[in-house]
């Protein structure tokens, strides 16, 4: 099993219940592929550096997951096909960082 940190950007048009439903879908996908979500953080609505699909803001969600690298392509394919998700990024790490993340700390200031 490999460790990954993931950031998923959701459309700013979505309400909290819809975002929660999309998060549940992501959780189920990871679990179905024998993976595990260790931690997650809500970074909230943030400005984008550049417009994505004519949006200048997005809801950021951060995850620490553990899954086989070979299964990651299935997750990426599913996320790419979801119109409610603007972007996603997975980074392989040796160890997960301690929470709260620096991004979360900046939000609280």
Regions flagged by a language model, labelled:
Residues 2-109:
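Structured, basic alpha/beta domains of bacterial-type, RNA-associated proteins
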């Amino acid at each position: 099993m490999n460790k990954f940190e993931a950031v998923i950007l959701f459309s700013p048009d979505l309400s909290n219940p819809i975002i929660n439903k999309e998060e549940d879908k992501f959780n189920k996908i990871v679990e179905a592929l024998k993976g595990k979500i260790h931690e997650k953080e809500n970074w909230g609505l943030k400005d984008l550096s550049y417009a994505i699909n004519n949006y200048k803001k997005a809801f950021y969600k951060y995850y620490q997951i553990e899954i086989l690298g070979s299964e990651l392509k299935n997750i990426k394919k599913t996320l790419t096909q979801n119109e409610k998700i603007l972007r996603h990024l997975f980074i392989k790490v040796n160890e997960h960082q301690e929470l709260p993340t620096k991004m979360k700390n900046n939000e609280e200031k």
